Regions:
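Short amphipathic alpha-helices in soluble, non-transmembrane regions
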Residues: 135-145
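Alpha-helix N-cap and loop-to-helix initiation/capping positions
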Residues: 71-74, 135, 171, 227-231
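Predominant activation on well-ordered alpha-helical scaffold segments within soluble catalytic domains
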Residues: 3, 52-54, 76-87, 141, ...
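Zn-dependent metallopeptidase/amidohydrolase metal-coordination segment
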Residues: 188-238
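Midchain, well-structured core segments that form catalytic/ion-binding scaffolds
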Residues: 1-131
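A short beta-alpha structural unit
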Residues: 101-110, 122-128, 154-173, 193-194, ...
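Glycine/charged-rich beta-loop-alpha catalytic/anionic-binding loops adjacent to active sites
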Residues: 58-64, 183, 219-223
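Short secondary-structure junctions
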Residues: 90-99, 147-154, 182-187
Length: 249
């Protein structure tokens, strides 16, 4: 990617922490916790880790009409069974805010009259607790191993990425909470972020804090995503007051 963009070999810009007091970020919640609680501001305590995987089933492509059920190696069916097993097993190890998602399923060749010889799913889960993340991964590995051993299709798991949960700076959280109480008394809460954000990256170099404003209907990553103008204005007020408090020391 760097080569295509013409940046290969160039030194990367680095933040000089000594030059900055820290980093503040405002964002829509992208969920419904604030709205369902009747609150207007969320002070982010931590940002979730996202662990992503590819799960691949290898079966045998064949005719959908002439291949007897007893001898089929239907990769699509094997995938669906694993997806159902994940949805049964994960609640046993999940926390209150753990989430998991099958984001994409691909069947090859993807024709209505052909038994899929290969099936692939992209799967992820999210949490802020490193120990729970490890337990979720073990559960996933066990289910994939069970599916592979049960046959008739082969199943393998590929880890794609594992981000690290990040705590927001305590002083910044306090400043945001005090500002929220000033501008929206009693209408705020501390909460983790279930989505990744810039603050998660910047927090590796400088103190970071983050606030949320409500998402209407808890909708995000969709054309209907929206936030009330009054809540956006309130978020700006809280952000400015918190920044002034932090800079005043």
């Amino acid at each position: 990617a760097l080569e295509r963009a013409g940046y290969a070999g160039r030194p990367r810009a680095q933040i000089e922490p000594a030059r900055y007091e820290g980093f503040l970020e405002a964002h829509i919640e992208q969920g419904d916790y604030l709205e369902s609680s009747g609150l207007r501001v969320g002070i982010v305590t931590s940002i979730v880790a996202i662990w992503q995987y590819r799960i691949v089933f290898e079966g045998a492509q064949n005719h959908a009409g002439t291949t007897r059920m007893a001898v089929r190696k239907d990769a699509g069916l094997a995938l669906v069974r694993l997806a159902a097993a994940l949805d049964q097993r994960f609640p046993e190890v999940a926390g209150e805010r753990t989430v998991w998602t099958t984001g994409r399923i691909t069947l090859d060749p993807g024709a209505p009259s052909i038994i899929p010889g290969r099936a692939e799913m992209l799967f992820q889960f999210r949490d802020v607790d490193p120990d729970r993340l490890a337990r979720l991964e073990r559960a996933l590995e066990e289910l994939v191993a069970e599916a592979d051993a049960a046959g008739p299709c082969r199943c393998r798991l590929e880890a794609l990425s594992r981000s690290v949960p990040k705590l927001m700076d305590g002083r910044f959280q306090d400043a945001l909470e005090q500002a929220a109480e000033r501008h929206a008394p009693g209408a705020h809460m501390r909460m983790p972020s279930a989505a990744g954000h810039d603050a998660q990256i910047l927090a590796q170099r400088v103190p970071a804090g983050m606030l949320f404003v409500p998402s209407i209907g808890g909708i995000s990553h969709h054309w209907s995503e929206n936030t009330a103008d009054a809540d956006i204005a309130l978020g700006c007020q809280v952000m400015a007051t918190a920044a002034a408090t932090i800079l005043d020391g």
